[in-house]
């Protein structure tokens, strides 16, 4: 029997609401403000949380100057259509693209994330 349910990924960032809005729009999850951070939630309870960090420094992937703290892989049906959509939300396409079945982007706070074909 599991001890817990629905683990939450917590992402450090300089503007929790802005980053929650970005991921909430990308995943079509609702945004919920809490007293000390912002969460996005799916209808079935999955959660990603965003917390404010005063001296936030984004990762510098793929180098280790400022190591990657985490990344999210999101499965999509069409890489080109998904790329257009995330760029419109404020993502940036990373110059380093190491594969053909996925694409690497940076969220508005500089965290890498990937759009992946299933």
Name each region found by the language model.
Residues 55-61:
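A short, acidic/glycine-rich surface segment
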Residues 107:
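Short, acidic, Ser/Thr-enriched surface-loop or helix-capping motifs
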Residues 115-118:
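Short hydrophobic/aromatic patches at helix-to-coil boundaries
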Residues 1, 39-40, 61-64:
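Short secondary-structure boundary/capping segments
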Residues 3, 7-53, 81-104:
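Core segments of cupin and vicinal oxygen chelate
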Residues 64-87:
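Mid-chain, well-packed structural core segment of small domains
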